[in-house]
Amino acid sequence: MKIIADTHAHTLASGHAYSTIKEMAAAAKAKGLKALALTEHAPEMPGTCGLFYFQNLDVVPREADGVRLLMGAEVNIMDPDGMIDLPEKTCMDLDIVVASIHPPCYGLDHTPEENIRAYVEVMKKPYVNIIGHPDDGRFPFDYEILVKTAKETGTLLEINNSSMRPQSSRKGTRENILTMLDLCRQYEV
């Protein structure tokens, strides 16, 4: 498989990454990527971009170092009803929207039923393109429902390499990723 795009990347603007857009575009080019999605964390994540950042992305060039730049956001799923932390209009103006559960924004005390409801509700939003790192065992849920809903809504499910790092705070990721991939194969997702 030849990877041609990175659809979930953070710059210095997200507060926990270390590269500029220019540096990331150069690295993407060196890896042979054709496109790079800049998906900074949305406002409820501590230390990241405010709303104005996302509303002002039209001033950023759409190409750097021969790599197409997609303007996006990694929105935070805030509750079991699928509420996110960017307005619909802002999301509709972006090229790509990744929706993820992060502990600072979504409590660890939700039930598996609430967790899958959060994912299902957010996948119903027409501007959500990808579910980010749905592999964290701290937020258990039914992967079969996730995969079936992704197929119904045309939402991509991310395999996030950061989840597999030994120092990752996410739990049970390898097993969860394998379960998700098996179900994707079974349901032809």
What does each model-found stretch correspond to?
Residues 1-31:
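N-terminal active-site segment of His-dependent metallophosphoesterases
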Residues 188-189:
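Short acidic/histidine-rich active-site segments
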Residues 2, 29, 42, 47-159, ...:
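Extended substrate/RNA-proximal surfaces in nucleic-acid metabolism proteins
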Residues 15-18, 48-51, 140-149, 167-183:
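Histidine/acidic-residue-rich catalytic or RNA/ligand-binding cores of hydrolases
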Residues 4-14, 38-41, 131-134:
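Histidine-centered catalytic micro-motifs
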Residues 20-24, 118, 179:
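Well-ordered alpha-helical segments embedded in enzymatic catalytic cores
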Residues 25, 29-32, 123-124, 185:
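Non-catalytic positions within long, well-ordered alpha-helices that form the structural scaffold/packing
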Residues 24, 39, 57, 146, ...:
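Aromatic/hydrophobic pocket-lining residues that form π-stacking "cages" and hydrophobic walls in ligand
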